[in-house]
Amino acid sequence: MMKKAYIPALLVLLSLLTLCGCHGSRGQNAFSVPDSFDESRQYEITFCAKNDTNKTQVDIYNKAITDFQALYPNISVKLRLYTDYGKIYNDVITNIATNTTPNVCITYPDHIATYLTGSNVVAPLDGLFADERYGLGGSALKYDGPAMEEIIPQFLEECSFSGSHYAVPFMRSTEACYVNKTYVEAL
């Protein structure tokens, strides 16, 4: 699967959140998957992402948004860039009370766990994943979206809290430890 399809896939999956206005404030009704997607209605999605001044990364985000908006002209995506994940976290936490949190953000699972301490702040994605039309691999998607079986189960499990999924693992960092065997044996 081409990497450029990941961000639009994430955006369209999570764009459904705006159909019910569920994007992170305390006391909102619990999220439910809409029966249909009204393409005549205008929607605006705020997408928060980390960028540490990497122009290539910004260009990829902008191209993904442009491509997505060409497919879904009734959805406007507002990109908000941050220099580190901590700033995204602080902004989301601060804006929960004012109902101005983003619809979509790239964040860590432990940050999501903190957001979940509020009532209906983060929408569970299981219903969206399973939606035959707009879910993972959905028939009505206007792009080649990933199917559930194309996502590594262990990565997806890290996005689960109390039996529900709250994130999509389209981006992963791999940590490794390299050891110089010669130096270790010399110790």
What are these regions (language model features)?
Residues A49-D52, A167-R172, N180, L187:
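Short beta-strand->loop
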